């Protein structure tokens, strides 16, 4: 199945603690059906001190389920993603709400 959410996409969180917030996808893990979104689903991590890093409590993004996020359209609203095949044979993603092309 083709990837509907890719690294670099702007997404909106649909459910959970951060519902309504948006951010850029940092990493997608398709086998686990999870993604990391910049500035969303932050957790506190207790970092041990090392030779080149100071110890303490740091904020870090945690993975979020792909079913709980949606790609944002040009208006910043969540949209479903469809696929089109262009005249030159390329397969591209498009926003179902506006019909705008997402990539390429």
Curated annotation (Swiss-Prot):
Q: Which InterPro entries match?
A: KOW (IPR005824), Rib_uL2_dom2 (IPR014722), Ribosomal_uL24 (IPR003256), Ribosomal_uL24_CS (IPR005825), Ribosomal_uL24_KOW (IPR041988), Translation_prot_SH3-like_sf (IPR008991)
Supply the SMART domains for this chain: KOW (SM00739)
Is the keyword rRNA-binding in the record? yes
Query: Which Gene3D superfamilies is this protein grouped with?
Result: 2.30.30.30
Gene Ontology CC: one annotated term? ribosome
Q: Which GO terms describe its biological process?
A: translation
- Which keywords, in A-to-Z order, does the entry hold? Ribonucleoprotein, Ribosomal protein, RNA-binding, rRNA-binding
**What family is this?**
Belongs to the universal ribosomal protein uL24 family.
Question: How does it associate, per the subunit comment?
Answer: Part of the 50S ribosomal subunit.
By what name is this protein known? Large ribosomal subunit protein uL24
Give the organism, scientific name. Methylorubrum extorquens (strain PA1)
Give the taxonomic lineage as stored in the record.
Bacteria, Pseudomonadati, Pseudomonadota, Alphaproteobacteria, Hyphomicrobiales
